[in-house]
Amino acid sequence: MKSKWFVLTIAVTLALFALNNLASALTYDFVGNNAKQWFEEFVNGDNTSMNEDAGWTLTADGLTANDNVGTGHQRIGIAAADWTDYTVEAKFKFLKFGTYNESHVYCRWQDEKNNYFFRTIKRNNAGNQNFWSIEWLRKVAGTDNEGDVTDDVNIIADLKVNTIYGLRGKVTDQVVDVEFFNGSKWLAAGSITYPGTYKTGGIGVGRSSCQVAWQYISVNGAGIPSDATPVEALGKSATTWGELKKGI
């Protein structure tokens, strides 16, 4: 009996070791005790790039885009040539609405002109002033391909300022499974098959025609470096990988 327990203990230990080394998590936490550290690393890091319209500050609400609610875009991300398949997620809130109210989360980020992303957007459709949806885009050399993920009112509808929402994408090769955080839970939004181009890349966030604040952006998967800073966004672990990130 003792030998069986010994074998079981060894197996569990090895499994936990593999999990911690093969699937780490990296969270840029913009509202916790180390928000300034994460802001500096994300905005001024060696692998960071952003577009010309960018202007970023750290406020009590998190990583905050400027208050220009015109149609100009702001986007920022970190490149990572060796990141392949992973899950990226961010929680955010709108501080001020404009015309389209876009909040973006980027994956396979190469730079500001080459990336994949998915976004919230509000369009006027046949006079409907409250037509919210989630869309996907692929940007190559500054040129876009785009399409719809969902406009299901049970997932995304009537979004408000100063309310926490989230976007999550599980990236597997060229497929991204998208979820939206609304009403205190994650909801499956749909899947995207991106038309080729990028097999690796980093993560980022962006916005257009609204002011947005991001509480955190997190990425996990094989090859993602872990960090040792506890993340306590919204008074709890920022992601489902929070315990793993802490090395527990």
Predicted features by range, described:
Residues 30, 90, 159-192, 217:
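Carbohydrate-binding surfaces in secreted/extracellular proteins
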Residues 67-142:
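Secretory/extracellular carbohydrate-interaction modules
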Residues 9-18:
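Bacterial N-terminal signal peptides
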Residues 22-50, 229-242:
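Extracellular carbohydrate-recognition regions
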Residues 141-168:
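Short, aromatic/His-centered strand-loop micro-motif at the edge of beta-sheets
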Residues 1-10:
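Bacterial N-terminal signal peptides that target proteins for export
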Residues 189-218:
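Flexible glycan-contacting loops in extracellular carbohydrate-active proteins
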